[in-house]
Design a protein with these regions (language model features):
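Phosphate-binding site recognition
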Residues: 1-127
Length: 127
């Protein structure tokens, strides 16, 4: 992983430009660790390795987004692809919080990610 402080500065720059930042890269590049160590203190952090959380999001992604009261992170976001259209709708409707999505490199190939978030998300890739 590149210098963590440099990456945090880059993520913060993207957050000033976009409502959503996508952090992607191959497995074991430090995406989750970077987000937990640098953002989880002041952001709501959701890890979608938790099956119950994925089920809740899948059952009503719009309600999940509407229930957010602060900036939030969806780590392993590719595990609940239903959320992408809901994020698009929320952003287009003036959602006032920032969102960081993380996932593996093939995350951007998922149907709905690029079409739903085009122009709404800045993409950073770790390698």
């Amino acid at each position: 992983m590149a210098n963590p402080r440099f990456l945090v500065i880059k993520i913060e720059k993207y957050l000033s430009m976009y409502p959503v930042v996508i952090l992607t890269g191959v497995r074991q590049t430090g995406k989750s660790t970077l987000l937990e160590n640098s953002f989880a203190k002041n952001w709501k952090y959701y890890n979608l390795d938790e099956r119950a959380l994925v089920s809740m999001i899948q059952s009503d992604p719009d309600q999940f987004i509407a229930s957010q009261k602060s900036n939030f992170i969806l780590d392993e976001a590719h595990k609940a692809p239903e959320i992408f259209h809901s994020i698009k709708y929320a952003v287009d409707s003036g959602f006032k919080y920032k969102i960081i999505l993380s996932g593996s490199a093939n995350f951007l190939l998922l149907k709905g990610v690029t079409e739903s978030l085009a122009g709404r998300a800045g993409v950073l890739e770790l390698y």
